[in-house]
Amino acid sequence: LQAGDEIRLTDGKGMFYKAEITTATGKRCLFKVLEAVPHPKEWSGHLHLALAPTKNMDRIEWLAEKATEIGFDELTFLDCRYSERKVVKTERIDKILVSAMKQSHKARKPLLNEMEDFKRFVARPFAGQKFIAHCYDEADVAGVAKASEDKAMDGGKPFLLDELDAGQDALVLVGPEGDFSIEEVRLAQAHGFR
């Protein structure tokens, strides 16, 4: 790149900028903004994904990249009873979010939160829709039957997209590889998750 070239920039907060390079050296680049262009969100609500990180970091990084490309707003890691990973280097995940935002031409970088205790997280207020993805049968969760070791993968549960009210804020919990404990599912449901 050299002086006079036009470039496109983003602030990561919803704006694109058309700019012209005024000075380009090996160590820095100066530019002047020619035009600010707001970029509307694809989803008018706030989409928050809270998940227990997997043992394999590659999977977490892939999810962060793809979720950014799709267009979610916030990511929180949860420390659950069956979590195999108790620490996530959010600096690396943040770099992946920035890279995915640029690669997919998004104007917003998702908010990235540090690892949080599951019990404290589900007790926090959230005004929007709240969902928890789990593999238990509803009878098991309700305590009607003993939690089965052989959990059905669908359990007759509805698909998330069928349950979401378009344009409203939504918080989705995704558990660890061994699923949430049944106590965690019950606690989440007691706090309004479905």
Where are these regions (language model features)?
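Short acidic/polar active-site loop segments enriched in Thr and Asp
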Residues: 2, 73, 194
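Short secondary-structure boundary segments
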Residues: 11, 79, 134-137, 176
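RNA substrate-binding interface of SAM-dependent RNA methyltransferases
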Residues: 38-135, 142-145
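Strongly charged, low-complexity linkers/loops
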Residues: 134-136, 141, 156-166
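Short Gly/Ser/Thr- and charged-rich N-terminal loops/segments
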Residues: 148, 153
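N-terminal positively charged helical leader segments and presequences
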Residues: 1-38
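A glycine-rich beta-strand to alpha-helix segment
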Residues: 20, 160-194
